[in-house]
């Protein structure tokens, strides 16, 4: 009946916001695709919001300003240690593509050879605390990452944090040769995970499940036909061109996503245990 129809749409037609971990970039393609696909769904309207260096994603979700956020699983655990009450619901990368990029032919044979050098880093980032402790890098001269690739290009001894999906390719496009040590190969591998609050899961389980279901559709779609999300992301980013973006998607498919795309989003509880032990 008409009354029943009104009831069902009002019960489920809801708008939710997914706050990203950074400005629009290729590893977020499946999330942006979900927003583009709102026209095909009448269950939930998904709005995706850009992050950035001044955006505290875990805080925004924990305080209820947005419903969902994308962040590294170690950041989620750090927030939970302060009582945030957050839970990962959808893994979009098997590990965050943190990498340490350095100049070739500067005497680096292992991560220990980076000790004593200047390092452009996002101050306070959790993986670096672990790397420093694990590999005894006590003399590194840390300074805040600004995104100025020119400084790196001019400073042979410097190394820099970035995403392996983008930073080496961006530097190569500027004619700067690099080598890298990924944080994953050093043994630290937090998920890149969409999360929400325990409260949201308890009070709106159908809504949370609907968002997960929508993402399970949008992620493979964004890989099969990457043009819509690529055009959008390139329109928002001056730092990445089509070649760098396409290369990032190929790296994602090779190293960061399950070979069976129907398993994108799935998580292994043991990985959270592994990470918790590393963060002690």
State each model region's role.
Residues 33-35, 98-108, 191-207, 260:
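A bilobed periplasmic-binding-protein/Venus flytrap-type ligand-binding module shared by bacterial periplasmic
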Residues 24, 166-167, 185-187, 236-237:
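Glycine-rich beta-alpha junction loops
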Residues 8-10:
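N-terminal signal peptide c-region/cleavage motif recognized by signal peptidases
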Residues 28-31, 58, 73-76, 111, ...:
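Extracytoplasmic/secreted envelope proteins and their assembly/folding machinery
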């Amino acid at each position: 009946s008409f009354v029943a129809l009104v009831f069902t749409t009002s019960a489920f037609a809801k708008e939710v916001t997914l706050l990203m971990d950074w400005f629009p970039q290729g590893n977020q393609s499946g999330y942006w695709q979900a927003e583009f696909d709102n026209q095909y769904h009448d269950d939930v309207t998904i709005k995706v919001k850009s992050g950035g260096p001044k955006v505290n994603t875990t805080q925004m979700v924990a305080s209820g300003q947005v419903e969902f956020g994308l962040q590294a699983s170690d950041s989620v655990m750090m927030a939970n240690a302060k009582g945030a009450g957050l839970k990962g619901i959808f893994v979009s990368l098997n590990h965050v593509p943190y990498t340490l990029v350095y100049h070739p032919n500067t005497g680096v044979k292992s991560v220990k050879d980076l000790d004593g050098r200047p390092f452009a880093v996002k101050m306070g980032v959790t993986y670096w605390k672990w790397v420093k402790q694990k590999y005894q890098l006590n003399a590194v001269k840390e300074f805040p990452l600004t995104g100025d690739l020119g400084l790196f290009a001019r400073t042979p001894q410097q190394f820099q944090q970035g995403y392996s999906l983008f930073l080496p390719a961006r530097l190569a496009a500027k004619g700067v040769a690099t080598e890298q040590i990924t944080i994953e190969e050093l043994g630290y591998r937090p998920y890149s995970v969409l999360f929400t609050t325990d409260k949201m899961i308890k009070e709106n389980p159908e809504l949370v499940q609907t968002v997960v279901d929508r993402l399970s559709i949008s992620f493979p779609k964004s890989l099969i036909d990457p043009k819509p999300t690529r055009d959008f992301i390139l329109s928002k980013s001056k730092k990445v061109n089509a070649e760098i973006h396409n290369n990032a998607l190929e790296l994602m498919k090779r190293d960061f996503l399950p070979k069976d795309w129907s398993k994108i989003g799935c998580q292994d509880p043991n990985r959270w245990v592994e990470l918790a032990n590393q963060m002690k």
